[in-house]
């Protein structure tokens, strides 16, 4: 067999052993995909004893390409919600997540200065302590730029030493915070549900009868409240007739309007229009019907709803829009993206025409456009290779192969489409590419660092590195957790999701979800902070490397 064939076979063996290890669980918590790293260490240990060598160039390419696949698909997945998460309700949670990252970086700086740990070792410990694999890849790249030899193997070894407590430390922090503040989980859930009306709610509907005489004869668009686009009127009942109103529809006393919006916005509209009545209009009478259709037609991607012309041509109203699992109130200026789910209302004989314009080709949702994938990867690698010169720094700062594809993917996923190219990726395809990428990356890291792992653990500084990792994991989480609970009165279940999301750690999320099953509160805060946390985790080791290098 050729060297390349042997290398690929060994990688497959590492993946099998590692994924098997990752499935082991203690009280529902396991290493998950991180088991591949330890699979590589085990295989490398026996290879080292028998003097077996692998093709270094093949390993290097597979490691870098796996990292690129992983961070790019992460960016595509979280991109649509990334910028929204930085605003409104997500601002507080993301601020706390940023504090955890900053405190982790400060912990690294303190350890580096106090105990005099080598730069490659402390960055490897940092990546393992925060259980973030792309952080490891970013750190390895910047150390290579700085000319530090053997950075890949030593960083990987230190990462493996710190990784297990990185997972356990998050769970311990959740438990200690619950113990210190004597938290009762059932009460926390009730308080969250009570307060959730002040946050971003899911959309609801209400039927309101027009009793305000000042509205008689006005156009629908002229009624105060419809101009701010927070509420949509999808149906109008006048006597026994139900129709789809337009912005120019004239309103009369005793008309019944079917409104869609958030609870607080609907309450304000009731004060203006009249009284709420119990009259079911969801089951449409006459020739009106409603449908949920998916945007799949490349010709409408990026178009604003008002430019579709489906209301003027066919009398069809878009009452709701679901994008990446988030329900939105559609406005005339809302631009459509591939995969948007629209709730439309119209006449039976014309709703099909509107559907044909928008697409609704379900099979397209399972297809992957490969051209945008490679365009995005190529642009990401180019961006990651652009040097940014900062006065006083010994080397130019680069986003690298971890940061470049991530930033480009976030931007492209937010844009959604350019012409007929769209950056939507089916969840199953995204997950498959992401898992393949991280398995390849961790397998190579394990093989490169496994040769001296056992010796370092038994005879070297392995136990010291574990202690440093515990410090980096535990201190930032506990400080932020106490601040969030004591001073910001953050709900405990949201806090658990925040801690897991700031460490981008799925096993910790599984533990947080199990604290109060079916509530979904922890998962909500995890998803809110995950995009920014992932970005900061990738950038922080690069900044730390340069700052510590200049301080040497």
From Swiss-Prot:
The keyword Electron transport does not apply. Keywords: Cell membrane, Membrane, Repeat, Transmembrane, Transmembrane helix, Transport. The chain crosses the membrane at residues 4-24, 28-48, 67-87, 95-115, 157-177, 370-390, 402-424, 438-458, 463-483, 495-515, 529-549. Gene3D superfamilies: Regulator of K+ conductance, C-terminal domain (3.30.70.1450). It is found in: Cell membrane. GO terms for biological process: potassium ion transport. One of its GO terms (cellular component) is plasma membrane. GO terms for molecular function: monoatomic cation transmembrane transporter activity. The keyword Transmembrane applies. Residues 190-275, 277-360 form the RCK C-terminal domain. It is a multi-pass membrane protein. HAMAP family: YidE. NCBIfam families: PRK03818.1 (NF003007), YidE_YbjL_dupl (TIGR01625). PANTHER family: K(+)_H(+) ANTIPORTER SUBUNIT KHTT, TRANSPORT PROTEIN YIDE-RELATED. Belongs to the AAE transporter (TC 2.A.81) family. YidE subfamily. This is Putative transport protein HSM_0534. It comes from Histophilus somni (strain 2336).
């Amino acid at each position: 067999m050729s060297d390349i064939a042997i290398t690929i076979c060994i990688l497959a063996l590492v993946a099998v052993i590692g994924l098997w290890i990752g499935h082991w669980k203690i009280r529902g918590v396991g290493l998950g995909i991180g088991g591949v790293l330890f699979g590589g260490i085990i295989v490398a240990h026996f290879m080292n004893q028998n003097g077996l060598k692998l093709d270094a160039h093949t390993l290097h390419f597979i490691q870098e390409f796996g990292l690129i696949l992983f961070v790019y698909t992460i960016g595509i997945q979280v991109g649509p919600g990334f910028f929204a998460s930085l605003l409104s309700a997500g601002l507080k949670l993301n601020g706390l997540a940023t504090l955890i990252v900053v405190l982790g970086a400060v912990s690294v700086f303190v350890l580096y200065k106090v105990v005099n740990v080598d730069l490659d070792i402390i960055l490897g410990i940092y990546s393992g302590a925060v259980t973030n694999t792309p952080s490891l890849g970013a750190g390895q790249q910047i150390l290579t730029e700085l000319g530090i030899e053997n950075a890949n193997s030593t960083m990987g070894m230190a990462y493996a030493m710190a990784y297990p407590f990185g997972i356990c430390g998050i769970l311990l922090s959740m438990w200690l915070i619950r113990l210190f503040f004597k938290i009762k989980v059932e009460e926390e859930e009730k308080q969250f549900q009570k307060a959730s009306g002040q946050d971003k709610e899911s959309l609801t509907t209400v039927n309101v009868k027009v009793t305000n005489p000042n509205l008689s004869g006005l156009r629908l668009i002229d009624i105060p409240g419809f101009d701010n686009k927070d509420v949509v009127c999808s149906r109008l009942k006048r006597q026994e007739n139900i129709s789809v109103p337009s912005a120019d529809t004239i309103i009369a006393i005793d008309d019944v309007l079917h409104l869609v919006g958030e609870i607080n916005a609907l309450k304000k509209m009731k004060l203006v229009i009249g009284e709420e009545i119990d009259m079911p209009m969801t089951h449409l009478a006459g020739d009106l019907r409603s449908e949920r259709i998916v945007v799949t037609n490349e010709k409408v991607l990026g178009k604003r709803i008002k430019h579709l012309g489906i209301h003027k041509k066919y009398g069809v109203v878009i009452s709701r829009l679901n994008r990446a699992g988030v329900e939105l109130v559609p406005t005339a200026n809302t631009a459509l993206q591939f995969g948007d789910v629209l709730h439309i209302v119209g006449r039976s004989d014309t709703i099909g025409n509107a559907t044909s314009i928008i697409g609704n080709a379900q099979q397209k949702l399972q297809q992957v456009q490969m051209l945008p994938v490679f365009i995005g990867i190529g642009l990401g690698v180019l961006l990651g290779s652009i040097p940014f010169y900062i006065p006083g720094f010994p080397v130019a700062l680069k986003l690298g192969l971890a940061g470049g594809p991530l930033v480009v993917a976030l931007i492209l996923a937010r844009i959604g489409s350019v012409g007929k190219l769209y950056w939507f990726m089916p969840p199953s395809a995204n997950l498959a590419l992401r898992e393949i990428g991280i398995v390849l990356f961790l397998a190579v890291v394990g093989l490169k660092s496994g040769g001296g792992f056992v010796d370092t653990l038994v005879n070297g500084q392995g136990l010291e590195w574990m202690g440093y990792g515990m410090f980096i994991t535990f201190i930032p989480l506990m400080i932020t957790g106490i601040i969030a609970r004591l001073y910001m009165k953050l709900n405990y279940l949201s806090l658990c999701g925040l801690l897991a999301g700031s460490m981008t750690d799925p096993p910790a999320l599984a533990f947080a979800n199990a604290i109060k099953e079916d509530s979904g509160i922890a998962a909500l805060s995890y998803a809110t902070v995950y995009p920014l946390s992932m970005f900061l985790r990738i950038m922080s080791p690069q900044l730390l490397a340069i700052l510590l290098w200049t301080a040497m």
